[in-house]
């Protein structure tokens, strides 16, 4: 999934197309794959967070004999990605699923009898979701509090706000949003919903704004930002999917293959960092990034939303006995 970023307008056959989105750290990601695979290699890529298809476009263009497995939990995003990749349709297999559900049995059911050599996860929320989906990911407009990346499954943010008990809401806001005012916000939500349900982004944003004293508002950010992040993570179970998905994908990755993951906040990055570190200790994987690769200043200037991106990379160097997989290791200092 491509993260929030600037838009560019493409043309096809002389006709202007709908603006599409700039792929965060696209140059760096492509360069890593170029260093590990030859241009003419029949590489099988897996884009576990297809988004608008921007990263996949780069891979298919650079590696003319490659194929790609395109996955996204949102059917609308998958459709948009397929439209963007229409020139490569014979080399694309699309699967509407969360990357945490990808395994060899699923791939085989789609006629894929190989394992991927190059895997990408872009964990950022897309510009489409934030500003064009109408699902309440942003408080720029008054929208229903949905926040589901797959609009056809799971509880909405509105249901969570109006059903969950106070202590559970407080824990969500504190754990996923690192919000110091979590207790007070949860208390006010519970009292407010006794009179009227909280159902729109404006209602929630205004409620939070009134609770947090202005002197404690984060510089340059709306005071409800952390609450919206926490709700989105809970609605979509994002952290659990990252943890479980990495286990499946690292086991699935072909010998000699490379997995690259872009994270956008500390909760995501901590899971990726610890998972990659633990697998590297098994001697079946090589950590290619002791420290994450950050966006260049040029990219940040061009696309300020990329500022928080962190890219981590792992290569599979040999098969790992199942009994050693997902083993817990002594924690290194954070």
Swiss-Prot record:
Any Pfam family matching the protein: Methyltransf_5
Gene encoding the protein: rsmH
GO BP of this protein: rRNA base methylation
Coiled coil residues, start to end: none
Reaction(s) the record says it catalyses: cytidine(1402) in 16S rRNA + S-adenosyl-L-methionine = N(4)-methylcytidine(1402) in 16S rRNA + S-adenosyl-L-homocysteine + H(+)
Protein's recorded name: Ribosomal RNA small subunit methyltransferase H
Binding-site residues for S-adenosyl-L-methionine, renumbered to this chain: 53-55, 72, 99, 122, 129
Primary localisation category: cytoplasm
InterPro entries cross-referenced by the UniProt entry: RsmH (IPR002903), SAM-dep_MeTrfase_MraW_recog (IPR023397), SAM-dependent_MTases_sf (IPR029063)
Taxonomic path: Bacteria, Pseudomonadati, Spirochaetota, Spirochaetia, Leptospirales
Keywords attached to this entry: Cytoplasm, Methyltransferase, rRNA processing, S-adenosyl-L-methionine, Transferase
Stated family: Belongs to the methyltransferase superfamily. RsmH family.
A GO molecular-function descriptor: rRNA (cytosine-N4-)-methyltransferase activity
EC number: 2.1.1.199
Subcellular location: Cytoplasm
Task of the protein: Specifically methylates the N4 position of cytidine in position 1402 (C1402) of 16S rRNA.
SUPFAM superfamilies, sorted: Putative methyltransferase TM0872, insert domain, S-adenosyl-L-methionine-dependent methyltransferases
One Gene Ontology CC term in the entry: cytoplasm
Domain of life: Bacteria
Keyword Cell cycle attributed: no
């Amino acid at each position: 999934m491509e993260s929030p970023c600037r838009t560019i307008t493409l043309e096809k056959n002389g006709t202007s197309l709908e603006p599409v989105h700039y792929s965060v750290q696209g140059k760096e990601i492509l360069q890593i794959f170029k260093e590990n695979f030859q241009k003419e290699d029949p590489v099988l890529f897996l884009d576990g967070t297809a988004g608008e298809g921007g990263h996949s476009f780069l891979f298919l263009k650079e590696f003319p004999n490659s194929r790609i497995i395109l996955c996204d939990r949102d059917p609308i995003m998958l459709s948009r990605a397929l439209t963007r990749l229409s020139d490569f349709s014979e080399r694309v297999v699309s699967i509407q699923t969360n990357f945490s559900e990808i395994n060899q049995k699923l791939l085989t059911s789609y006629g894929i009898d190989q394992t991927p050599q190059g895997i990408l996860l872009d964990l950022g929320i897309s510009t489409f979701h934030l500003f064009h989906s109408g699902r309440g990911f942003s408080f720029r407009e008054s929208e229903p509090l949905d926040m589901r990346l797959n609009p056809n499954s799971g509880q909405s943010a509105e249901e969570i706000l109006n059903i969950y008990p106070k202590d559970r809401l407080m824990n969500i806001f504190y754990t996923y949003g690192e919000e110091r005012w979590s207790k007070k916000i949860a208390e006010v939500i519970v009292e407010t919903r006794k009179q009227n349900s909280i159902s729109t982004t404006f209602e929630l944003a205004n409620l939070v704004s009134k609770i947090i004293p202005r002197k404690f508002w984060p510089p340059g950010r709306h005071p409800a930002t952390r609450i919206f992040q926490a709700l989105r993570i809970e609605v979509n179970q994002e952290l659990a999917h990252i943890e479980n998905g990495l286990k499946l994908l690292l086991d699935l990755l072909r010998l000699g293959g490379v997995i690259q993951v872009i994270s956008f906040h500390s909760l995501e990055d901590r899971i990726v960092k610890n998972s990659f570190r633990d697998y590297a200790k098994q001697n079946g994987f090589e950590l290619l990034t002791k420290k994450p690769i950050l966006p260049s200043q040029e990219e940040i200037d061009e696309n300020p939303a990329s500022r928080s991106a962190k890219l981590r990379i792992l290569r599979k160097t040999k098969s790992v006995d199942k009994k050693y997989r997902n083993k817990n290791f002594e924690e290194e200092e954070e």
